């Protein structure tokens, strides 16, 4: 079983894979250990950990000794990275593109986290860059800070209405 970790700015997303099939997934807070949320039987079956991290700390120090693959900007990816400043390109963005890349197809990868990122890979297999914009929490803070009447929303609905019928639902 493989444990795949994406350690972002605010939280850590994880996926458990058996062969190439997703077995389970979730999100944990940065200060929690993966061992505190997974069943000991599942933990004992993990033999490879693959991770990319934006921050330094990973929640795996309590795990048994298993092979750990740290993905970074020097890793080999299935496409060419055609980016002016590759040393500044977030590894989380490249990993998200790798997970979605299909040879011979162009793709736009949108990842919603602390920031919302948009990344484009051409049909010929060239990562060409993208855009970074504020995430949901930053957007809510901005709407409240820079308008007179929009309220601050600190919790948002996971499945909002398609068309809002109140100010909060519209936001």
Predicted regions and their residues:
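Acidic-glycine-rich active-site phosphate/pyrophosphate-binding loop
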Residues: 69-78, 114, 151-159
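Conserved phosphate-binding catalytic cores of ATP/NTP-utilizing and phosphoryl-transfer enzymes
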Residues: 78-107
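Active-site rim beta-loop-alpha module in soluble metabolic enzymes
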Residues: 126, 133-171
